[in-house]
Amino acid sequence: MTKYFTSESVSAGHPDKIADQIADAILDAVLAQDPNARAAIEVTTSTGDVSIFGELSTSAYVNVRQIATETIREIGYNHAELGFTADSVNVSNKIVEQSGDIAQAVDNADDDPEQLGAGDQGMVFGYATNETDSYLPLTLALSHRLMRKIRDVREAGIVGYLRPDAKAEVSVELDDQDHITRIAAVVLSTQHDENVSLEQLRKDVRELVIDQVLPQELVDDKTIYYINPSGRFVLGGPQADSGLTGRKIIVDTYGGAAHHGGGAFSGKDATKVDRSAAYFARYVAKNLVAAGVADKLELQIAYAIGVAQPVSLNIDTFGTAKIDEAKIRDITAELFDFRPLAIINQLNLRRPIYKQTAAFGHFGRTDIDLPWEALDRVDEIKARL
């Protein structure tokens, strides 16, 4: 039976990603002054408007409006015809202080007063696969690369009529062993100026973006290309669709290849296990796969609010384990400390490093240096096999 798998990505100019980048830009600015700040910032975008709200406890002062407008300008919304520009947008700031009840639960863990308790209950997942050098599913890796490439040709003026909003989707065909045999379909929709023909756009995007990214050994004469299949895409970004932080959590993580605990990343400081523990779970999963314990691996960690130690830890190798899964779990529990403060210290997460993750994925990044992508525990794992 023929099987298929698909992942998608969106550009930095997508309305939801604008919101994520503003939230993380504010977080970075706060952390640059106050590494111990607590933040849970949410952002909405719509035509001519950005609303910023959530909770923040910090000694830092940051100019929220300036950060928002600078972020919008960097993304490329700087022309009046886009209907949403850095110079004209209305920014409202409704941030309030974090609840004292939450703060006391985090500051003194119920099971260890010297540790930070988890900032909330919930579960997170980490995943890695040896399908690609980035340890991400190929479909997601290619979708992200398509979005970075179309940004690059737009910003370099190579295709000057492109606008910031875009989406990509890659589908692959799998054999009975779930190995990729070919790329079945590519979908790419991009915002554009009014005066370009659909024929010209499709030609340029195919030649200058798609053909530069796809591995040609996986492309054949049956590969289907859908480039702006809806036709006209002049109105885009927040002028056409509202945006909200945390609405692209599958794009941010594993493209649908793994489970997701439901918690978003952007705008949250590292005491929020939604973010920090998800990063650490990726770090652990990636090092385990790189050590050869399995071809792909998913790690689940669950927490209780105000408690440092995880409630549970589970590993699934999808039938690809090279050793017994129980041994993989024992090695994981022995080598890695999953308490929130330990995670923060191991990955040095009280730094302004988050805005760069808010577009093109939080994992598998080869264009930036992220601590949870380091393969620095492989030898320790191998020594215990």
UniProtKB/Swiss-Prot annotation:
InterPro entries: ADOMET_SYNTHASE_CS, S-AdoMet_synt_C, S-AdoMet_synt_central, S-AdoMet_synt_N, S-AdoMet_synthetase, S-AdoMet_synthetase_sfam. It is an enzyme of class 2 (transferase). It is found in: Cytoplasm. Binds 2 divalent ions per subunit. Residues 98-108 are annotated as: Flexible loop. Mg(2+) binds at residue 16. K(+) binds at residue 42. The keyword Hydrolase does not apply. PROSITE patterns: ADOMET_SYNTHASE_1, ADOMET_SYNTHASE_2. Its main location: cytoplasm. ATP binds at residues 14, 165-167, 232-233, 241, 247-248, 264, 268. GO terms for cellular component: cytoplasm. Its EC number is 2.5.1.6. One of its GO terms (biological process) is S-adenosylmethionine biosynthetic process. It holds the Pfam family S-AdoMet_synt_M. It catalyses: L-methionine + ATP + H2O = S-adenosyl-L-methionine + phosphate + diphosphate. Its cofactor is Mg(2+); K(+). GO terms for molecular function: ATP binding; magnesium ion binding; methionine adenosyltransferase activity. L-methionine binds at residues 55, 98, 241, 272. Pathway: Amino-acid biosynthesis; S-adenosyl-L-methionine biosynthesis; S-adenosyl-L-methionine from L-methionine: step 1/1. Keywords: ATP-binding, Cytoplasm, Magnesium, Metal-binding, Nucleotide-binding, One-carbon metabolism, Potassium, Transferase. Catalyzes the formation of S-adenosylmethionine (AdoMet) from methionine and ATP. The overall synthetic reaction is composed of two sequential steps, AdoMet formation and the subsequent tripolyphosphate hydrolysis which occurs prior to release of AdoMet from the enzyme. Homotetramer; dimer of dimers. Belongs to the AdoMet synthase family. This is S-adenosylmethionine synthase.
